[in-house]
C-alpha cells in the first residue's frame, strides 16, 4: 500500500491515544515514534499496533524522559531526511501544549512547527460532550491500546479523552 500521510509522535502509544481515530479512518499512514527504539517490549507493542492498522512505521531511539527534551539538532536533521523522502499530503504531530503538558510532546511539536510547511496538523480534542468518535472507532482505539500491555498504568489515565479525538 502506498503511504502519503505522516504521523510523528514522541512515544509508542501516543499515536493510538491521540491519533488512533485517524489511523483507523484513513489508509496510507507512515507513523514514526521518536523514542523507545532500543526497548524491545515497547518496540514490539508499537509494531503490533501498526500492523493491525496497516500503517508503515519506524521507531527511533531518542531518550524517553518525563521532564525532558530531545537533542533538537539531531532530531531536526533526522526529521528533515524523513520529510524529504516524499511529498506528504498530511503531517500530524503533537500540539504545542503537548496535549497534557508532556515536555517531550511540546518539544517535538516545536521542532515540527519549525521544519514543516503548510500541511502540518496537530492532535486536538473536542470539548463538546456531545461530539465523540463513532462507537466503532472508539472500539478500534481500545483494541489498539490493549496491545500496549506495558503501558496499562498510563493508558488508564486517558480513558476520558479516547472518544474525543
Could you tell me what each predicted segment is?
Residues 1-87, 113-117:
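Active-site rim/loop-helix segments in enzyme catalytic domains that contact anionic ligands
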Residues 1-8, 69-165:
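Metal-dependent de-N-acetylase/amidase catalytic core
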Amino acid at each position: 500500500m502506498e503511504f502519503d500521510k505522516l504521523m510523528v509522535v514522541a512515544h509508542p502509544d501516543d499515536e493510538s491515544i491521540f491519533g488512533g481515530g485517524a489511523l483507523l479512518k484513513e489508509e496510507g499512514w507512515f507513523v514514526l515514534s521518536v523514542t523507545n527504539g532500543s526497548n524491545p517490549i515497547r518496540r514490539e507493542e508499537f509494531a503490533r499496533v501498526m500492523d493491525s492498522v496497516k500503517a508503515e512505521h519506524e521507531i527511533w531511539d531518542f531518550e524517553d524522559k518525563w521532564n525532558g527534551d530531545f537533542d533538537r539538532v539531531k532530531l531536526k536533521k533526522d526529521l528533515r531526511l524523513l520529510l524529504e523522502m516524499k511529498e506528504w499530503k498530511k503531517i500530524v504531530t503533537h500540539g504545542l501544549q503537548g496535549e497534557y503538558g508532556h515536555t517531550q510532546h511540546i518539544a517535538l511539536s516545536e521542532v515540527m512547527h519549525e521544519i514543516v510547511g503548510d500541511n502540518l496538523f496537530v492532535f486536538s480534542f473536542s470539548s463538546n460532550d456531545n461530539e465523540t468518535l463513532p462507537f466503532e472507532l472508539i472500539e478500534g482505539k481500545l483494541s489498539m491500546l490493549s496491545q500496549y500491555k506495558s503501558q496499562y498504568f498510563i493508558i488508564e489515565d486517558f480513558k476520558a479523552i479516547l472518544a474525543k479525538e
